[in-house]
Amino acid sequence: MKASELKNKSMEELTAKAAELSQELFNLRFQLHTGRLENTAKISSVKKDIARIKTILSEKRG
């Protein structure tokens, strides 16, 4: 997900997407600890997407 795509979204959409990605991160971590996760790089990409969204949200609030 690119930052330029995120800048065009509303605050509500960004908040909803952040919540969705947080849930996905929880599920990925659960899969990692139960030994069912094959693509461990997915965790870091989801974390980076969450950080991008939080950055855009703080820019819009500021």
Curated annotation (Swiss-Prot):
It comes from the Bacteria. InterPro entries: Ribosomal_protein_uL29, Ribosomal_uL29, Ribosomal_uL29_CS, Ribosomal_uL29_sf. Pfam families: Ribosomal_L29. Keywords: Ribonucleoprotein, Ribosomal protein. GO terms for biological process: translation. GO terms for cellular component: cytosolic large ribosomal subunit. One of its GO terms (molecular function) is structural constituent of ribosome. HAMAP family: Ribosomal_uL29 (MF_00374). NCBIfam families: L29. Belongs to the universal ribosomal protein uL29 family. This is Large ribosomal subunit protein uL29. The gene is rpmC.
